[in-house]
Amino acid sequence: MSTKTVLVWYRNDLRVHDHEPLTSALHKNARVVALYCFDPRQFGKAPFGFEKTGPFRARFLLESVADLRRSLRQLGSDLLVRRGHPEEVIPALVSELEIAAVHYHGEVTSEELVVERDLQAALAPLNVPVRSFWGTTLVHPDDLPFAIEAIPELFTDFRKQVERSAAINPPLPAPAKLPPLPAVDPGEIPQLADLGLESPVTDERAVLQFKGGETSGLARLEEYFWQKSLLKSYKQTRNGMLGADYSSKFSAWLALGCLSARYIHEQVQTYETKRIKNDSTYWLIFELLWRDYFRFIAAKHGDRLFYTAGLRGLDIPWKEDWERFELWRTGQTGFPLVDANMRELAATGFMSNRGRQNVASFLTKNLGIHWHMGAEWFESRLIDYDVASNWGNWNYTAGVGNDARGFRFFNILKQARDYDPDGAYVKHWLPELAGLPPARVHEPWKLLPVEQKRFGVRLGVDYPQPVVDLFQSAAANEAIYNAAWEHHHRKRRGQPRSRT
C-alpha cells in the first residue's frame, strides 16, 4: 500500500459528502491529512471598520469545524486545526509530515485567490504539487455551455442556456472509512474569545436557531424536504419573513459548504419522484442557479465586483453619512419594515431575502449612502455570508451591477403591505408598535396625538419619526443616479469602439 500522504485543506467546504479533494486523495490510496486553518486576516476589520467575521458567523464556523472533526474521527481520522496564514502553515506541515501533494477547493474572489497563489509559490521550492478542485456550485464550469469569460451578463440569459444544455453531476458519496492520521498534534479549535469576539446572545425570537456543521445541515434538509414536506410549497412561501418554515434556510450551510448544492439537487430529484414535481421543486433549483450565477460572475469580473462603481462602472457620488447609517444599522429609521429587519439581523445574524432587498434599497435609494457600508455590515453580521452573492446582490440593488435595471426603488410601504399585511413580522421585532392595528402599523407617522395615546406609542419617544420622506428622498437620489448614468454614457460615447 502506498505511503503517499495528501494534505486536504478545508476552506468553505466543511463536509465529507461530495468532496472531490478528499475523494481524489483516497482514490490514490493515499494517507489523508485534513486541515482547517483559522486565518487571522478573516477576523480583522473591513475598510469601514466593521469586523469582517462577526460573532454569529464565527460561532457558526466554530460549530461547523467541530462537526467536521467529529465526522472525520468517526471515519477513523481527525482534523488538524491551526491558526495562522495558510500559505505559511501548510508548507510547514508539508515539511513536518512529508506531504506529497496538497488538495483543496478553489475560490473565485481576490483575497482567497491571493492566498492560493502565495501557497503555490511557497510550495514550489518543495516540489509539492498543488491541485485545486471546483466544488462550490451546482453546475461545474466544465459543463457550462460557455467559457467563464463568456458568461452572459444577464441572469435570465445565463439560466436559460444552463437549463437547456448544462449537465448537473451527481454528488460524490462520503467515504466509508479514512486511514488514521500520522503522529501529529491535531490542535485545538479556538474559542470565540481567542478570535477577539464575544459570544452572541441567543434571541428566542429568531426564525431558526442555526447550528453549524454538516450534521445540522443534513438534518435541516431532512426536516424541510421529508419530515414536513415543505418543498412542495417553497415558491409560494419563500418570501415570508416570520417563522422557520417559510423558506429552506439552507443558505448558511451552503455558504460554508456544510451542504453541497449537488446533494440538494439530488434530493430535489428524489422528492420529485417520491412526492411531487411542481413549480416549487423547480424554484429551489432556480435559486441555486442564482447562487451559481453570482459565483461565475465573480470569477469573470474579478475585483470589479468590489469597485465603488460596481460591475457597471457607474460613478455615483455616494454619501458616507454615519449618523443616518447608524439609524439604518440599529433599526431606528422610522420605517417599521426596515427597522424590524435590521433589528432581526443585529439580534440573530439572519434576515430574509425579501428583507435584504428592502433594507439595501432603502440605504442606497432613499438615504443615498455608500453601498459598500451596507455590504460590509452584511458581511460582518450575516450567518450565511457568501462573498459572491453578497457583493453581487449589493451591486444589483445599488444599481451598479451588470444585471441592474437602472434606478430600481423598492416602495417600502407597498412591500410591507404585500409581505406583512397584518404587521405580525413588524410587531415581532418592534414591540413598541405591538398595539397598533394593521392599518397603522406600517405608517406610524400618520398617528394623530389621540391615536398615539390610545395605542400606547409616542412618536419621537417610543418610536422615531421617519428619517426621510420616502418618495421625496427616492426622487432626489434618482436624479443623482440619472446624472451619473448620463455622464457614464457620454464617456462611453467618447471612447473608441474597440474599448469596453
From Swiss-Prot:
Record flagged with keyword Transcription regulation: yes
Cofactor note: Binds 1 FAD per subunit.
Gene Ontology biological process: photoreactive repair
Domain of life (superkingdom): Bacteria
Annotated family: Belongs to the DNA photolyase class-1 family.
UniProt xrefs under PANTHER family: CRYPTOCHROME, CRYPTOCHROME DASH
Function: May have a photoreceptor function. Binds DNA; probably functions as a transcriptional repressor.
Name of protein: Cryptochrome DASH
Source organism per UniProt: Gloeobacter violaceus (strain ATCC 29082 / PCC 7421)
